A protein has these predicted regions:
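Class I S-adenosyl-L-methionine-dependent methyltransferase catalytic core
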Residues: 1-211
Length: 211
């Protein structure tokens, strides 16, 4: 939490707008802002709302250059569960996939595209009880005229309970855990915006390019 805010302060960007429905992390963001601005000759402009993205006042936002988000995966990322104001979290408010998609996920993306030139969304298809929900495809289908492509983002392995790594006798198998943690995990970042070639610098050239 707070990594995107930290990245903003480390960059040349001048303004940052964000939101978080968790009052605890919201307070920590205010502390981050205060501490980071102490190191700068000119404080940066930052505004964060204590609400979910579905309640963000988009009409009050200026034109945005770049929006980056990783919406809580349906029925997977249950942030602040059991905490203060958990009822404001998307997993609590949108507890069925169709409702999550139609009232939260896609409308938030649509509102974002109205104010932002580029939108980058980190999301994977959640698999619940053996059923894969194709969140990525649904996002691309919704904004296919603005779809620019996707990049892979390497991530740390998500923590899991030790019981997942028990052997046949039910005993914890550290070697099994180490093997799992040493694997490389990649998640998609879906890219949207006006037509442009964002990936030309990383594309491998071939002789065909000369003809």
């Amino acid at each position: 939490w707070g990594d995107r805010l930290a990245g903003f302060f480390a960059s040349n960007a001048e303004e940052y707008y964000g939101c978080d429905p968790n009052p605890n992390t919201y307070r920590r963001y205010q502390e981050q802002i205060s501490q980071y601005n102490k190191f700068l000759a000119k404080p940066k402009k930052v505004q964060i709302w204590n609400c979910g993205a579905e309640d963000l006042p988009y009409d009050k936002l200026p034109p945005i250059d770049c929006a980056f988000t990783s919406p809580p995966y349906f029925s997977t990322e249950e942030y602040n569960k059991g905490g203060e104001l958990e009822e404001n979290q998307s997993w609590f408010k949108f507890n069925e996939y169709d409702k999550w998609r139609d009232d939260f996920y896609l409308p938030v993306a649509e509102n974002t595209m109205k104010v932002s030139k580029y939108m980058f969304v980190n999301i994977m298809d959640p698999k619940i009880h053996g059923v894969r929900y194709r969140s990525g495809d649904e996002l691309v289908d919704k904004f296919k005229d603005k779809f620019l492509g996707q990049v892979g983002m390497r991530i740390m392995q998500r923590p899991q309970g030790k019981a997942v790594f028990n052997d046949e006798d039910g005993k914890f198998d550290k070697a099994k855990l180490d093997e799992h943690m040493n694997k490389m995990f990649i998640e998609n970042v879906w890219c949207f915006g006006p037509e442009s070639d964002l990936f030309k610098n990383s594309r491998v050239a071939t002789l065909d390019d000369f003809f």
